């Protein structure tokens, strides 16, 4: 087959979305539930390791995510819709310049998704790993345990995003409250909840921005999220989206980020924790420092920092970050800020700041 024929046959098949059939989804869900999460938790170094269990399940409910812009980068959907780019990407698979070399008839949908995500100049929106979220809930939140006399705690996820933390909450067995303004995302989250949520636990999903969600006093056992990065991922055009509603970074910091942190403070029980996963990027060079300062202004005490181990691609030299792909050594040199990463070769880390009320 020549490249045009390969291109045309894929276009005829349609975009390689994740499967949506019940059997496939149930298999992935069971892998997530049966995964031994304690293997991810390194309490000595305060590191949460990485595993992708359950991530594909979240993505299978979020087909719109393939077309969401990150800064000026191209989306995977834009590559798919451009004959020249798509042909180039297919050529990389056929010639083995990008991945393992494969003949046309052996190329899978998974190969296609990988190529579309990693095509030069392309960035796909990020999702939180369900296993990492569940591990955080394991560390910070009580579960239903007749033996220990505890009942399942309630967590709030201010920026639900694409379902990684919701699936983590389901896997960990905690009650979950979530907020997010994006309509198609919200619809996907409702389906995840309806299909996989435990009947005896509560999942309250709210389509609104976290700055407008006022929890009841002392109603929360843990607040945990990865807030949006001002103006980086254009999640949707809803007027409630934080970077549409607050058009300057100062306004966004004050009215969105600080207000969300204040809402968390109001809702948390005394002695309980807020955990925020943020990282400095080229677009926002002081996101970490600003987040810690704002939390302190609200009244929190910064008691700890846990580290999320992020994916390093092929051979540990290329690293996927919120900024796009970079090499590990470059990433180490690039990091500007006061929160020094654990020095473990072949791995990249992002902080999750822990604040106590």
Residue ranges and their predicted role:
Residues 1-63, 67-357:
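Class I S-adenosyl-L-methionine-dependent methyltransferase catalytic core
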